[in-house]
């Protein structure tokens, strides 16, 4: 009996310690900032982000506060993705995961050993709220692949945007199994939501991101991996004592590529990659675009393809051809204006001029002929004073 009481008292003491720690973190957290500022001061966490406007990269960076992003999977890639978006000042983050933090996760980024035993979404929410209290964080601790939870997931991403009843602006898949990817794919096809799929290989030396626009690009069911196409149970592929390798570097790079393209999509700058891979062995970054499969097994994907085909295509503006003719062929000064890239005909120097020029050199200009110089000199003399010999000039100077 006494042992049980001692154990309970130890648990109570531990809980009190955790509560006090949370209170300390809350007291040390900065106050919320109502409006982003570009003022360059040490106390402004957004000054370097707002500098993107001054450098004409982003037109209005503060729009990021109006965006809601759902992240499914808060593991090696997902937790770093959430961290980056939080530091960027995203308006709202919705986190989905049902796993707990373990010491085996410490080789990856973000989580700390003292968070072992906490649910990943709870541990992430605590840290993210401390990093940036301006971000609204919503957590869901359940497996989205079950029948009941899938309906909850479907409802959440379609109604939990920045405004209640509005869908999220983007869904980011950071899960490590194909079953969850297929669930996200089905939900986004049904809700017609754009989303990014991401992943890291089991040998930890390659990763990828894929931007999926329902109806426009291939969904995850259009060209499924072998493990999905053959209806293989992933759990039968795993043996006790065998696990996938993981490197924080590969996961950090994949998360960086994912967030970079998510920001380009949300803030409308740069080019969003449809598919971008990464191979760490030779630093290779393949890019491609996957077209949708007209025989896809997902009926919602087929419906989105039909809607996309019926959507009016954007009309390309006709660019008028610019004439190469000079704007002013003649003028009072006899100067002809030509384009910068127009060929200039060079007159070949006379043979007498090039006779004494070394090989590889050419004259910068053509010297006038001697007869022309003499004629010009005589003409100038005739217009001015009369001709006087040198002897007469000397005599005049001596007599002065």
From Swiss-Prot:
Pfam families, per database record: ThiF (PF00899)
GO cellular component, one term: cytosol
Residue stretches in coiled coil: none
List of residues binding Zn(2+): 219, 222, 296, 301
One GO term (biological process): protein ufmylation
Zinc recorded as keyword: yes
InterPro entries: D-isomer_DH_CS1, ThiF/MoeB/HesA, ThiF_NAD_FAD-bd, Ubiquitin-activating_enz
Origin superkingdom: Eukaryota
Keyword Nucleotide-binding: yes
GO molecular function: ATP binding; metal ion binding; UFM1 activating enzyme activity
Active site, per annotation: 243
Keyword annotations from UniProtKB, A to Z: ATP-binding, Metal-binding, Nucleotide-binding, Ubl conjugation pathway, Zinc
Residues reported to bind ATP: 76, 97, 120, 143, 177
Role, per record: E1-like enzyme which activates UFM1.
Family stated for the protein in its record: Belongs to the ubiquitin-activating E1 family. UBA5 subfamily.
Protein name per Swiss-Prot or TrEMBL: Ubiquitin-like modifier-activating enzyme 5
């Amino acid at each position: 009996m006494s042992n049980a009481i001692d154990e309970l008292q130890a648990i109570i003491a531990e809980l009190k310690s955790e509560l006090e720690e949370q209170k300390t973190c809350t007291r040390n957290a900065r106050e919320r900032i109502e409006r982003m500022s570009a003022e360059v001061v040490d106390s402004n966490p957004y000054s370097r982000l707002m500098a993107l406007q001054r450098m004409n990269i982003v037109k209005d960076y503060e729009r990021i506060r109006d965006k809601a992003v759902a992240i499914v999977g808060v593991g090696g890639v997902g937790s770093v993705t959430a961290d980056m978006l939080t530091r960027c000042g995203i308006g709202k983050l919705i986190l989905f995961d049902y796993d707990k933090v373990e010491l085996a996760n410490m080789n990856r980024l973000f989580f700390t050993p003292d968070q072992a035993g906490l649910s990943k979404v709870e541990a992430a929410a605590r840290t993210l709220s401390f990093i940036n209290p301006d971000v609204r964080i919503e957590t869901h601790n359940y497996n989205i692949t079950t029948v009941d939870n899938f309906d909850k997931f479907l409802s959440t991403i379609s109604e939990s945007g920045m405004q209640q009843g509005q869908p999220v602006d983007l869904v980011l898949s950071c899960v490590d199994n194909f079953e969850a990817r297929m669930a996200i794919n089905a939900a986004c096809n049904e809700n017609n939501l754009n989303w990014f799929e991401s992943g890291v290989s089991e040998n930890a030396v390659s990763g990828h991101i894929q931007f999926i626009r329902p109806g426009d690009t291939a969904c995850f069911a259009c060209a499924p991996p072998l493990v999905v196409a053959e209806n293989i149970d992933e759990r039968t592929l795993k043996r006790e004592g065998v696990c996938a390798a993981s490197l924080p570097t590969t996961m950090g790079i994949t998360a960086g590529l994912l967030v970079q393209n998510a920001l380009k999509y949300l803030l409308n700058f740069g080019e969003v990659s449809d598919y971008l891979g990464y191979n760490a062995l030779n630093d290779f970054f393949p890019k491609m675009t996957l077209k949708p499969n007209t025989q896809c097994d997902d009926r919602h994907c087929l419906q989105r393809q039909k809607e996309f085909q019926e959507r009016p295509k954007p009309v390309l503006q006709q660019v008028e051809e610019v004439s190469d003719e000079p704007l002013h062929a003649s003028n009072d000064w006899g100067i002809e204006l030509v384009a910068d890239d127009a060929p200039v005909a060079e007159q070949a120097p006379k043979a007498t001029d090039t006779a004494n020029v070394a090989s590889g050199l050419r004259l910068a200009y053509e010297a006038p002929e001697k007869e022309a110089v003499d004629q010009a000199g005589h003409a100038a003399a005739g217009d001015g004073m009369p001709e006087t010999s040198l002897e007469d000039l000397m005599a005049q100077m001596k007599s002065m």
